[in-house]
Design a protein with these regions (language model features):
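Double-stranded DNA-binding cores of transcription factors and transposases
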Residues: 1-10, 49-59, 63
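Active-site-proximal, Lys/Arg-enriched surface segment
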Residues: 98, 102-184, 285
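Electropositive, glycine- and tryptophan-enriched low-complexity nucleic-acid-binding patches
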Residues: 165-243, 247-250, 254, 261-264, ...
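Catalytic or ion-translocation cores adjacent to nucleophile or general acid/base/metal-coordination motifs
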Residues: 206, 213, 315-316, 322-330, ...
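DNA-recognition alpha helix
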Residues: 69-90
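Basic, short loop/linker segments at the boundary and entry of helix-turn-helix/winged-helix-like folds
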Residues: 15-59, 206
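An anionic, glycine-rich sequence signature occurring as long contiguous blocks
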Residues: 2-3, 8, 226-229, 235, ...
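Short, conserved catalytic/metal-binding motifs centered on acidic residues
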Residues: 28, 58-59, 73, 97, ...
Length: 487
């Protein structure tokens, strides 16, 4: 007779969880060394029931769990601090109440934050290095996407450090701006490299260089700096500075001449004023009437002429002074820019000396970054650039070039383009590929401008250009995902 199955007393006990996805994430975090690395971070707080490091890990897990507020750890519909299965997956004895997590976060110093960031970078570095190598093997190029996105907070709050009012989600709101960089990854599609928090009034145009530097720091790879282009630009800039200095010298000479003419007129006015005063005394002493053609009347007319002339000379002097001030400011600006360019060239020469393995790299940026100085900088740093221009004057200039017979190229379901090669934009001396976009939205026609610098002859494949640039929607999708919580 067969025996009935009996329960194995040593079998593991099943533990229920309301946060199932956090379990494999925790096991993976253990596998890659994240948990162990975070447990080694120094935090200036004594242990009570749980270590400060456990509470920092709990804070990370609460973010992954979608806790919009810290108190959700204990008071949410599925309290995380009661989930032993998740704690065990993250190699912890249990979770603290949210108030304990709050006290630990308050105890963290700048050094603690730096240590946590370093821990995260150490753990993520092998993944980034692998994707960099795969991307270079697969396509021979690294493709970066950069963006600046708003992170609004309560408009009445006074407890968020460094928050400021700025443009976020089509409205002025209180909060922060997050500068993000991602890498196009053969394995994951999108691999986040860096995020930096800034006050809410930060604008995209001020962050282009920082995004590039963050990408290079995370990947450890950079292209060959285009020092030849920059050196030529400096030569041209010196010529512009010399021209500005000549105009400044001319303005100084003009001011000197204007002062001389003013002094001459003032001297004549004083002379005729004295004549009028003497004649008035004489006429009163002799009781003579002042007739229209008398000496006194003629002297008064000559004095009036000098006074009007003096007023004009004073205005001439004011104009000459303003003109000289503008010329002096122009020279000062040119000198400052030349010094900046020379420092950039020196740095880029050093970069090339310490770059035995230059790579090909592309940066895709939205219109907020696409002004002339930023495009020029990225070109000089060695990047191929895909961006948009938001300058209304450029859009209008391109629209005026389009004739009724000019053919538009269909590049999307609701998009057409016309492209030109060898164009320049304000404050960028390098020739660019420029395309005018046309979109039909209802009864309205909208326009945009794409910019490109690089090896690809994008004007011969405008549909490919349009598609590749809009591939940066992966970072925009990531931004939207990051603004929502994981459920």
């Amino acid at each position: 007779m067969s025996q009935l199955p009996t329960e194995d007393q040593n079998a593991p006990t099943a533990t229920l969880t309301s946060h199932a996805m956090l379990v494999p994430w925790g096991l993976f975090a253990q596998h890659i060394g994240l948990v162990e690395t975070l447990e080694g971070v120094s935090i200036p707080q004594r242990r009570r029931e749980y270590t400060p490091q456990t509470k920092v890990i709990e804070f990370l897990v609460s973010i992954l769990a979608g806790c919009a507020y810290l108190q959700d750890i204990s008071r949410g519909p599925h309290p995380l601090d009661q989930d032993l299965a998740v704690a065990q997956a993250w190699k912890q004895e249990g979770w603290a109440d949210y108030s304990g997590v709050s006290r630990t976060l308050k105890a963290c110093t700048e050094e603690t934050v730096t240590s946590v960031k370093e821990a995260l970078e150490i753990v993520s570095r092998p993944f980034i290095e692998r994707e960099v190598m795969l991307a270079l093997l697969d396509r021979g190029v690294l493709v970066y996407d950069g963006d600046l996105t708003g992170r609004p907070v309560s408009s009445t709050s006074t407890t968020y450090p460094g928050a400021a009012f700025g443009w976020m989600s089509d409205a002025v709101q209180l909060g922060y701006q997050a500068a993000l960089v991602s890498l196009h990854s053969p394995t994951y599609g999108r691999l986040w490299l860096s995020v930096e928090q800034h006050p809410g009034d930060t604008v995209s145009s001020s962050q282009a260089e920082a995004l590039v530097q963050a990408a290079e720091a995370r990947t450890g790879a950079r292209p060959w700096r285009r020092t030849d282009l920059l050196a030529e630009r400096i030569t041209q800039h010196r010529a512009l500075l010399q021209e500005a200095e000549v105009k400044q010298a001319s303005a100084q000479a003009r001011l000197k001449e204007t002062r001389h003419r003013l002094a001459q007129v003032e001297q004549e006015r004083q002379m005729w004023a004295q004549d009028v005063a003497e004649l008035e005394v004489m006429y009163r002493a002799r009781n003579r009437p002042e007739r229209p053609h008398s000496r006194l009347a003629q002297a008064r007319r000559r004095l009036a002429v000098r006074e009007r002339r003096l007023s004009r000379r004073q205005k001439d002097l004011e104009r000459a002074q303003r003109w000289l001030e503008r010329r002096q400011q122009k020279v000062a600006d040119q000198q400052a820019e030349l010094e900046q360019l020379q420092q950039r060239l020196d740095q880029f020469i050093e970069d090339n000396h310490t770059n035995p393995w230059p790579i090909r790299a592309i940066f895709r940026l939205d219109g907020g970054f696409g002004n002339g100085p930023n495009v020029a900088l990225l070109i000089e740093m060695g990047y191929e650039v895909y961006s948009k221009a938001t300058n209304a004057n450029l859009i209008q200039d391109l629209r005026r070039r389009v004739l009724p017979a000019t053919p538009w190229v269909r590049v999307g379901k609701n998009a057409e383009m016309i492209a030109w090669e060898g164009e320049t934009i304000t404050n960028c001396p390098y020739p660019l590929d420029v395309a005018l976009e046309r979109f039909q939205t209802g009864d309205k026609e909208r326009h945009g401008v794409l910019l490109h610098y690089g090896e690809e002859r994008v004007t011969a494949n405008q549909a490919g250009w349009f598609t590749f640039y809009n591939g940066r929607q992966t970072i925009e999708a990531g931004v939207k995902e990051g603004k929502n919580v994981f459920q």
